[in-house]
């Protein structure tokens, strides 16, 4: 009986040991599952990180290219601006050169021709020059005798007492004024009428 008991005890010990081994095995299996899940998550995060790094590199490359394009654009526009300032008057000057030629021809004939022919040549040259200026948007400021004085377009050089013109009107134009595309290029220099003292 003792032997039976002893065998039963041994059998119970073996059962407990076997159960312990089974529990450890199950626990080991659970740790293996967790380890596999963690490794899977790490691989997923590494893949996402690689994708984000590639996207960041592509964005950086795009930024660098666009920055270079912007710098090239700035340099090109600066060069164009300098060229425009340097040669912007080229077509105007090409149109003025024939006027210079006409004046030189008129001066060349001044000795050999009558005064009336020289005056006619000067009139023609003056007309050519005004036509060229008009082509480029330059027109004379209205400033004839009797025109109402306008300080936006006229510069009063002096006041003249006159009875035949209303006060604050142009008496005489000393130098014509000009507009460039409706913006004042230079004012007309004029004398302005005032009421005579003896009439006041």
UniProtKB/Swiss-Prot annotation:
Any one GO cellular component localisation term in the record: cytosol
Superkingdom field: Bacteria
InterPro entries associated with the record: GrpE (IPR000740), GrpE_coiled_coil (IPR013805), GrpE_head (IPR009012)
Keyword set includes Cytoplasm: yes
Keywords attached to this entry: Chaperone, Cytoplasm, Stress response
Primary localisation category: cytoplasm
Gene Ontology molecular-function annotations: adenyl-nucleotide exchange factor activity; protein homodimerization activity; protein-folding chaperone binding; unfolded protein binding
PANTHER family attached to this UniProt entry: GRPE PROTEIN, GRPE PROTEIN HOMOLOG, MITOCHONDRIAL
Subunit structure: Homodimer.
Function: Participates actively in the response to hyperosmotic and heat shock by preventing the aggregation of stress-denatured proteins, in association with DnaK and GrpE. It is the nucleotide exchange factor for DnaK and may function as a thermosensor. Unfolded proteins bind initially to DnaJ; upon interaction with the DnaJ-bound protein, DnaK hydrolyzes its bound ATP, resulting in the formation of a stable complex. GrpE releases ADP from DnaK; ATP binding to DnaK triggers the release of the substrate protein, thus completing the reaction cycle.
Similarity annotation: Belongs to the GrpE family.
The name this protein goes by in its record: Protein GrpE
Recorded name of the encoding gene: grpE
